[in-house]
Amino acid sequence: MVKSHIGSWILVLFVAMWSDVGLCKKRPKPGGGWNTGGSRYPGQGSPGGNRYPPQGGGGWGQPHGGGWGQPHGGGWGQPHGGGWGQPHGGGGWGQGGSHSQWNKPSKPKTNMKHMAGAAAAGAVVGGLGGYMLGSAMSRPLIHFGNDYEDRYYRENMYRYPNQVYYRPVDQYSNQNNFVHDCVNITVKQHTVTTTTKGENFTETDMKIMERVVEQMCVTQYQKESEAYYQRRASAILFSSPPVILLISFLIFLIVG
């Protein structure tokens, strides 16, 4: 019996405390902001007065109406009413006048599409009608069938190109067309560049260079065609309905 009475009193006490807390939350606060008697912002009429008193009637440690440590009505560390670090009132930080930082022109944003386009265009050689320059290769070891040309190649291989010019493989019907075009443009471009430097190629040079460049163009074709077919296979795989359904289901599981 005693235990039941004690439980009832505890329940009544808990309800009373809860009701008192709810009334305290709903009860309106008198006046304005924190530790003030009226409006939170100056200039808004209120029977309780303003949060920031007029000049001449400052709060604790305010000789001239400013905030704490404010000799002339400014913000903290503001000697003359400006923003922080503003000696004579006015605009934004470090500005002595009335011009706001909002009036400054915004910096132009970098367009990501333009950046991506510039990066993609970097692989295309300017002035060569869409030809691309392949990565540097080690010059192949080739035997020409006679000791003179073999020795000549070993002694002069630095004069021959180690990169080739080419178009995308999907623009050609077979390897022979790709290699033929690759050899012609690479030899022509290298010959023109070398001639402008004051060097000339002999008939032996041209014969050896065409053979070397042909081998490099074959290597370039194999590399490019492999990458091309891998891209096509990936596109076909990810465009198939079962894969799309599976990806959609996984996204649903992650998001949901």
UniProtKB/Swiss-Prot annotation:
Subcellular location: Cell membrane; Golgi apparatus
Xref: InterPro entries: Prion, Prion/Doppel_b-ribbon_dom_sf, Prion/Doppel_prot_b-ribbon_dom, Prion_copper_b_octapeptide, Prion_N
Region Interaction with GRB2, ERI3 and SYN1: start-end pairs: 25-233
PROSITE patterns: PRION_1, PRION_2
One Pfam assignment: Prion_octapep
Molecular-function GO term, any one: copper ion binding
Residues annotated to bind Cu(2+) 3: 80-82
Binding positions (Cu(2+) 2): 72-74
Signal peptide range in chain numbering: 1-24
Positions of the UniProt region annotated as Interaction with ADGRG6: 25-41
Domain notes: The normal, monomeric form has a mainly alpha-helical structure. The disease-associated, protease-resistant form forms amyloid fibrils containing a cross-beta spine, formed by a steric zipper of superposed beta-strands. Disease mutations may favor intermolecular contacts via short beta strands, and may thereby trigger oligomerization. Contains an N-terminal region composed of octamer repeats. At low copper concentrations, the sidechains of His residues from three or four repeats contribute to the binding of a single copper ion. Alternatively, a copper ion can be bound by interaction with the sidechain and backbone amide nitrogen of a single His residue. The observed copper binding stoichiometry suggests that two repeat regions cooperate to stabilize the binding of a single copper ion. At higher copper concentrations, each octamer can bind one copper ion by interactions with the His sidechain and Gly backbone atoms.
Similarity annotation: Belongs to the prion family.
Task performed by this protein: Its primary physiological function is unclear. May play a role in neuronal development and synaptic plasticity. May be required for neuronal myelin sheath maintenance. May promote myelin homeostasis through acting as an agonist for ADGRG6 receptor. May play a role in iron uptake and iron homeostasis. Soluble oligomers are toxic to cultured neuroblastoma cells and induce apoptosis (in vitro). Association with GPC1 (via its heparan sulfate chains) targets PRNP to lipid rafts. Also provides Cu(2+) or Zn(2+) for the ascorbate-mediated GPC1 deaminase degradation of its heparan sulfate side chains.
Protein name (database record): Major prion protein
Lineage start: Eukaryota, Metazoa, Chordata, Craniata, Vertebrata
